[in-house]
Amino acid sequence: MNEQLLPDIAAQATHHDLPLHWVGMAGIALPIQLAGQALNASVDIGVSLDDAGARGIHMSRLYLALQGLAGKPLTLAALQHLLDDCLSSHHELSDSASLTVRGALPLQRPALVSQLSGWKHYPFEIHARQDGRGLHMELQVELDYSSTCPCSAALARQLIQQRFAESFAQQPLNYLDVLDWLGSTQGIVATPHSQRSTATLQLRLAADCIDLPLLALLEAAERALGTPVQTAVKRADEQAFALANGQNLMFCEDAARRLHRALRQLPQASAFRVRVVHAESLHAHDAVAESRWNWS
């Protein structure tokens, strides 16, 4: 059959006369490069259908335009160029185009003391939208960290004090006896509870932002929290992590405030939202805190 004779149903008029906010495709597989790493991403891409009389959009045009990013570095300039192409191919139908890129960035992280290192995945989402008001970009990342409960730590210290008083009340203190006692389960009778916790950070990028600040955001967040989860460890690393947790007690409220202060220092941010979840080991529910700045 001659290709020119193939029917194009999407180009036909509709009888409903109703514009649609967004029409497109979700979950398109796409290999990309991000922060120097090759990874597989999932992309949602679409346009508004502002012509109320048009039955549909040209999805194949969006799909083919997206393939121009395959295997290439994902940059703000590349995203803007892609959205411009989407609008150009739908100039008679659409006033806005948008896409979401989802994936997990693998980063190598060193151990605290030893020469070991390992890889961690950082889930991310990049949201981009082009409309009559210009380009709008948002970046979202997730990172895991350890949190030790300050209340539980205080209760554990109290129990240790009580056991010390019971053990040495009727005898003069001897340095070696106390040292042995401190290294025994008889002496350290309680430990505070800790849990793996997750922070979700949403950053709205400033208009003058040139590069995706993914690494800068992750580094700032992990510095603020102080106890990011580890990868490969030896006993010396595990001991250093125990020390870091003991000197870094925090409720979910503390974590949210630390992250808020850290994100306020990022020049690439015009607005942000923070959400932390502490998956409590004491309770059957989570402890959650949120903070935001200039977010609406």
From Swiss-Prot:
<dbReference type="InterPro" id="IPR003801">
    <property type="entry name" value="GTP_cyclohydrolase_FolE2/MptA"/>
</dbReference>
<keyword id="KW-0378">Hydrolase</keyword>
<dbReference type="InterPro" id="IPR022838">
    <property type="entry name" value="GTP_cyclohydrolase_FolE2"/>
</dbReference>
<dbReference type="Pfam" id="PF02649">
    <property type="entry name" value="GCHY-1"/>
</dbReference>
<dbReference type="GO" id="GO:0046654">
    <property type="term" value="P:tetrahydrofolate biosynthetic process"/>
</dbReference>
<feature type="site" description="May be catalytically important">
    <location>
        <position position="149"/>
    </location>
</feature>
<dbReference type="GO" id="GO:0003934">
    <property type="term" value="F:GTP cyclohydrolase I activity"/>
</dbReference>
<protein>
    <recommendedName>
        <fullName>GTP cyclohydrolase FolE2</fullName>
        <ecNumber>3.5.4.16</ecNumber>
    </recommendedName>
</protein>
<comment type="similarity">
    <text>Belongs to the GTP cyclohydrolase IV family.</text>
</comment>
<comment type="function">
    <text>Converts GTP to 7,8-dihydroneopterin triphosphate.</text>
</comment>
<comment type="pathway">
    <text>Cofactor biosynthesis; 7,8-dihydroneopterin triphosphate biosynthesis; 7,8-dihydroneopterin triphosphate from GTP: step 1/1.</text>
</comment>
